[in-house]
């Protein structure tokens, strides 16, 4: 009844996010090494089908919760972490909450059909308007393949719009291919003539391939790839959790781009990684310029904007604990992640500048060009503003006019004086 609470909106953005919740669970499986192909099909009537080749969602009886796992997953909100077979652990780095995403999307659907291949059976589930119809069907299956296929149609009585544009799928699937190296996403999009157009997204080397694609060989410095894994915590009295990150970075004369991902979610509003990049780059590049004596006497220091103008950076991080600003996962706030990224980027930049002095020289020179051109543009803007302001100033338009003495805006006075 209130999709905005979970999906962030009851409009098309919320409907799109409900798709991402289902996709997330398939990505989690593939990232753990269970299947490397995810098929996504969009039909003209607005229905969507997502099929993975993972282990198949758990359907067996959960003794602890005294319910079947399929009920927890599809019918109970916030069941993520409760479900799971005895021999199937939860994911170390989870994108989907599995139990919030599946269940909330199911409740927001006109219908949902699920087929699960696992343990030598095909399990079938059918839901209508949030209700399971007919329980679960179990059919013996001799094939060796496993996986989950979910087809559903978002409910127009829940969302104000369910016509998800092609651009959404193309953007999301490309981004997921970028941060999930080696996983292939195959999109089939139904056309007006009922045929399907097929699109494939795959980056064997993940963010490194993506950075090279963006730069297209036209870069100031080559792409640098850094990675690390460490234990972090958000506060002294808080527990440690695991963080790993991959960073692709280059400088360009033409392109400026920063993209941050966490547990595969694109962080549209950045948060912790963005703050880390600003702090680390400003500190190290400023030191580089200062130590090489490139600042002129009394010159102002660079700002991050001067670095950003020529910086191409993509960060994909994963953690076992994450503080998102909300369920739409567009920004993270973890202090531990921010501090670790700041330290690691600082360290890698310092080593990079020492080991590649020619690149360091190019970066320092380009950042100073950006800074000085920005300052010149600002001076020109201020001078023009001053000139325009003066020309529009009514007090200076006609000489020898005396300012009004009355504070009453209803009064009007005009004095005409002959002579000087």
Role assignments for model-derived ranges:
Residues 11, 62-66, 203:
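Residue-level signature of the cytosolic catalytic core of signaling kinases
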């Amino acid at each position: 009844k209130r999709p905005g609470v979970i999906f962030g909106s009851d409009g098309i953005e919320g409907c799109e996010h409900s798709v991402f919740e289902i996709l997330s669970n398939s990505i989690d499986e593939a990232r753990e090494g269970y299947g490397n192909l995810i098929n996504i099909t969009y039909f003209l009537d607005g229905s969507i089908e997502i099929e993975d080749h993972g282990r198949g969602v758990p359907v067996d009886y959960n003794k602890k919760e005294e319910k079947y796992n399929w009920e927890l997953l599809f019918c109970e909100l916030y069941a993520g972490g409760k479900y799971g077979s005895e021999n199937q652990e939860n994911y170390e780095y989870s994108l989907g909450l599995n139990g919030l995403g599946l269940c909330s999307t199911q409740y927001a659907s006109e219908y949902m059909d699920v087929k699960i291949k696992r343990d030598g059976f095909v399990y079938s589930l059918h839901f209508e308007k949030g209700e399971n119809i007919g329980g679960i069907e179990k059919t013996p299956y001799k094939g060796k393949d496993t996986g989950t296929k979910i087809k559903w149609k978002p409910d127009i009585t829940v969302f104000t719009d369910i016509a998800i544009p092609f651009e959404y799928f193309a953007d999301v699937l490309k981004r997921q291919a970028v941060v999930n190296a080696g996983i292939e996403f195959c999109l089939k999009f139904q056309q007006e003539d009922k045929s399907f157009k097929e699109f494939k997204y795959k980056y064997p080397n993940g963010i490194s391939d993506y950075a090279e694609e963006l730069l297209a060989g036209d870069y100031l410095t080559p792409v640098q790839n850094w990675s690390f894994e460490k234990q972090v915590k958000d506060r002294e009295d808080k527990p440690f959790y695991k963080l790993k990150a991959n960073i692709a970075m280059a400088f360009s004369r033409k392109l400026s781009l920063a993209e941050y991902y966490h547990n595969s979610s694109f962080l549209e509003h950045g948060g912790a990684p963005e703050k880390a990049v600003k702090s680390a780059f400003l500190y190290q590049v400023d030191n580089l310029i200062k130590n090489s004596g490139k600042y002129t006497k009394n010159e102002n220091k660079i700002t991050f904007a001067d670095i950003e103008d020529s910086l191409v950076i993509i960060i994909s991080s994963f953690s076992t604990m994450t503080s998102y600003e909300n369920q739409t996962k567009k920004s993270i706030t973890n202090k531990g992640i921010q501090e670790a990224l700041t330290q690691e980027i600082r360290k890698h930049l310092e080593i990079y500048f020492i080991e590649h002095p020619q690149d360091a020289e190019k970066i320092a020179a380009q950042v100073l060009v950006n800074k000085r051109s920005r300052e010149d543009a600002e001076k020109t803007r201020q001078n023009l503003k001053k000139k325009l302001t003066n020309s529009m100033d009514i007090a200076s338009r006609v000489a020898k006019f005396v300012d009004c003495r009355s504070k009453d805006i209803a009064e009007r006075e005009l004095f005409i004086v002959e002579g000087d």
